[in-house]
């Protein structure tokens, strides 16, 4: 610890275990979206279901955030600024809906089944309308594949990569990768552009493991001059 280190102790007379864990989760969600935050250290998520005081979460959290903002405005910006940031909207710390949880578990189970059977080239396609929550689902999936102890054997035996074609969205994921200290398991970065990823695999003689592709339908089908191989 440094002599300049500060600790904020947060308490409330309505706190119970579930509400406390939800407050912690939301703090990770908000702080990982703040530009001045370099690294989020405690990353164990504990999303809670409905409980006695769950309806007070929003109001209590806002009160806590405003109180923290009085102490450090650069670390705790106005809530609306945080919530409108691109990183916030793509953060893996969002509480998933039941549909998103079911989809994520289905994907993970299919990955496990494919690995167990020694299958290669397995394609898992996720479809959804714009605004259906695919971005948060994908972000949460990547974070689980990289960090969840329950499925750690997947990363132990496979490199994990996220392929993103859109420059702005790639910048968002690169920022998340930096703040959450994502590690693909290889010399490659986790989030990469398609041509960069394919060229890096070839250059480093690395075999792809589990690859999550964002907006896969937008990938080029024509030959790209920056790609050293054939069409993709």
Predicted segments, located by residue:
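Conserved RecA-like ASCE ATPase "motif II neighborhood" in helicase/translocase motors
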Residues: 180-232
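Switch/connector loops and helix/strand junctions flanking conserved nucleotide-binding motifs
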Residues: 15-21, 170-172, 219-221
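Pre-Walker A (Motif I) flank of P-loop NTPase domains
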Residues: 118-125
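Conserved helicase motor core of SF1/SF2 NTP-dependent helicases
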Residues: 97, 104, 108-115, 127-132, ...
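AAA+/P-loop NTPase substrate/partner-engagement loops
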Residues: 144, 148-182, 194-200, 204
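Hydrophobic positions on the alpha1 helix immediately C-terminal to the Walker A/P-loop
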Residues: 137, 141
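Beta-sheet entry/capping signal
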Residues: 6, 123, 159-162, 207-211
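Boundary/linker segments flanking structured domains
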Residues: 3-114
């Amino acid at each position: 610890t440094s002599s300049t280190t500060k600790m904020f102790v947060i308490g409330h007379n309505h706190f119970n275990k579930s509400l406390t864990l939800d407050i912690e989760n939301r703090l990770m969600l908000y702080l990982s979206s703040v530009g001045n935050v370099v690294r989020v250290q405690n990353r164990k998520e504990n999303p809670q279901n409905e409980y006695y005081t769950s309806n007070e979460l929003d109001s209590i959290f806002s009160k806590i955030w405003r109180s923290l903002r009085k102490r450090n405005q650069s670390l705790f910006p106005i809530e609306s600024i945080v919530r409108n940031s691109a990183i916030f909207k793509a953060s893996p710390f969002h509480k998933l809906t039941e549909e998103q949880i079911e989809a994520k578990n289905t994907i993970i189970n299919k990955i496990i089944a494919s690995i167990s059977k020694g299958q290669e080239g397995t394609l898992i396609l996720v479809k959804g309308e714009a605004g259906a929550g695919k971005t948060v689902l994908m972000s949460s999936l990547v974070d689980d594949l990289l960090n969840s102890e329950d499925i750690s054997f997947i990363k132990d035996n496979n490199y994990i990569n996220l392929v993103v074609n859109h420059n702005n969205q790639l910048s968002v994921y690169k920022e998340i990768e930096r703040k959450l200290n994502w590690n693909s398991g290889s010399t490659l970065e986790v989030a990469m552009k398609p041509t960069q990823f394919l060229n890096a695999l070839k250059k480093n003689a690395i075999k792809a493991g589990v690859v999550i592709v964002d907006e896969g339908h937008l990938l080029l089908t024509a030959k790209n001059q920056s790609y050293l191989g054939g069409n993709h």
